[in-house]
Amino acid sequence: MDIIKNSLAGIEYTSDYINSLSEVFEAATSYIPSSTQTNELRDISLYDHVKLTAAFSLCIFDYLCENNITDYKDALFKNSDKFYDKPVFLIYSADISGIQNFIYNISSKNALKSLRSRSFYLELIMETAVDTLLDRLSLTKCNVMYSGGGHTYLILPNTQNTKETIKTFENDLNKWFIDNYGTEIYIGGGYAACSANDLKNKTDGSYSRIFREISQNISEKKMKRYSAPDIRKLNSHKSDDNERECVICKRSDKLTEVNGKCICELCAGLLKLSDSIIDPNKKCFYTILDCKPDQKTAVSLPFDLFLTVNSADELKENMKNNEHYVRSYSKNSMNTGKRLSSRIWVGDYCSAKEFAIMAENSCGIKRIAVLRADIDNLGQTFVHGFDDKYNTISRTSELSAKLSLFFKYNINSIMKKPVFRLNENAEGGRNAAIIYSGGDDVFIVGGWDDVIGAAIDLNNALRKFSCGALTISAGIGIYTPTYPLYSMAQNSGRLEDISKGNAGKNSVTLFDENHCYHWDELCNKVIGEKYALLREFISNNEKGKSLLYKILELIRCRKESNKLNIARFAYLLGRLAPDNNAPEEKVQKYNNFSNVMYSWIQNDEDAKQLITAIYLYVYMIREENNENE
């Protein structure tokens, strides 16, 4: 109560502070159950209960007003059973397409800085879009069920005004996307009308029907994205074979000169703002204005708005005296203030500013790795993740909020405090950077050994967080730090798709399609068993390091020809044998090693796992002067 009392002291009771009030209540009551009845589940927080109550109240009020219902007592109390069946609400969802291409389709120049800035910029585009729609409908953040990763779900009133406002909103936003990015980015939206009983899943399946209808509407819009005028406008641009390009993103319009280099306005603005955007230790605010400031760097946003970065003092000045001030956001911290929309949870962990530094700090071979991952069957989890009697909007909202917090904020702690390491002597946080971590989608780059460790930690943390109910599939590619960025993203995405195609998903693919495993198999069999044996035996055997390549080649040949040269394999193992006068302990270790290796080589699954383990071990011991071996 003291938290609420002290925070409310600086809040004025006007509409400008409604989101700040919500922030205070969220901070204080997110982990207090809404019900203390012993015969009820206590899985809905007091915050979510109050937030949804406020959202429904606003929707009901707008519905009553548009339908000229003025006798509230009669409609809501005397005839409440009838009202519960009326389609009072719209569940609206919007989804931005083209996010990945927008983020990754850049040159390797200042790649890490550009990647993280563009990722955060897209997050702000979605936040700005959501807040603009809410403002046009005179609603608040309470009406947001979920927002992140280019997706959003809102609870809106089922009125004609809402439907017309949504149509105008989508047209305005897509027009801005066309004007600024052509067909690269598009937003598709869809909604479904529903009653209170539908949201309570009074009739089994009525709640899941809402989301099926929304998904179908969005799919139809994405199939028919552009009108005839849109297409004519898109085709009106004539490219010149000799026209200049932005050195970062390769676009050929809205160009400017920066330090003698040709850069588009967006990349130039993001570069100037990048330190404020991506530095996790820098306290700043992201201020939205309806007029481009004269003396300050600003980046264009939809709806004729502009993004600039303020210190706390600059923000206070804007709030007080700038007539063009619209709203502001904070990152990973709660604040209150005039039209301070909300804090944005952001996975912003970063250990270095260049890929080359990450490669140099990696163990063994000097390479970076790219991790791409997302939750398996997330859509089905929201629609069918609960038994029918528990499948309600309260639980969907709670699940959405907690998943968003996990991937956008808790992931920073996962990176700062590693649990699993390939290199047991490493210390400190991960040698890596979070490029993008949305509602369920993750992109991490870093030293190859730390990225593999981070992937395992992330999987284990999600399993613990969801009590085993949610799984994640991932792809991890390993590259030189100068490898084209878009190709890194594309190749790692292909590896992720291979994992998604594995039986039961819940998998990770390393290197290429030949190294796809369920997480337990990778951790327990590949690393915990085979990699551990190689490390224990080979680390004290100089001959073993050079013979590993020959053993690896022999196993590969077995796979390709379905034949194993037993004599050759026995010869290679024999070369690892200790001298006749070696201690008994060393002889026993060798005998165990050779027997186990001989057993593994004759079994398809074990042989496959052994190949991956050898890859990992060779990478760990590879020295700079023989990386080309």
Give the predicted meaning of each segment.
Residues 1-150, 154-629:
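Charged, helix-rich terminal subdomains or tails
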